[in-house]
């Protein structure tokens, strides 16, 4: 399995197997406590994937859990940066996604971004989250969870 560095720390309730949760090939189901989701509370997910050798890459995706009743919202943006040395990164893609709307049913959503093919050893993936729950939520202004799986 390729090494994954968590540049932001997941919430203690949703750490499970750490960064390997994002690349172990096991997708999360609707039970977000199953150990197949990694969760961030009020902060963006920022991880670096080491491919061990330079490889061509042209897309990245993450699956996010949507469960507004439990204050679990998807990513609002996905940024991808690449590097040959793991220190100097350059952005190759950035995509925004809509904030989850009131009444959205519980589901898993695939957020992806495609870009011109690049060769890189390291890939930094940043999943941006809504900083606070929207006005329509029962806890407006509070922090929210963003749960991700591969």
PLM-predicted stretches and their roles:
Residues 97-103:
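Surface-exposed loop and turn segments in beta-propeller and other repeat-based domains
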């Amino acid at each position: 399995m390729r090494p994954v560095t968590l540049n932001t720390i997941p919430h203690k309730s949703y750490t499970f197997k750490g960064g390997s949760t994002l690349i172990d090939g096991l997708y999360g189901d609707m039970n977000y406590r199953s150990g197949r989701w990694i969760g961030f509370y009020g902060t963006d997910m920022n991880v670096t994937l080491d491919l061990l050798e330079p490889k061509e890459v042209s897309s990245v995706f993450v699956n996010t859990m949507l469960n507004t009743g439990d204050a679990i919202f998807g990513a609002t943006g996905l940024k991808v940066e690449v590097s040959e040395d793991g220190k100097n990164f350059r952005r190759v893609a950035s995509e925004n996604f809509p904030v989850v709307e009131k009444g959205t049913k519980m589901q898993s959503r695939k957020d992806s971004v495609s870009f011109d093919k690049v060769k890189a050893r390291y890939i930094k993936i940043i999943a941006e989250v809504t900083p606070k729950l929207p006005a329509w939520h029962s806890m407006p202004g509070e922090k929210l969870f963003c749960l991700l799986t591969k």
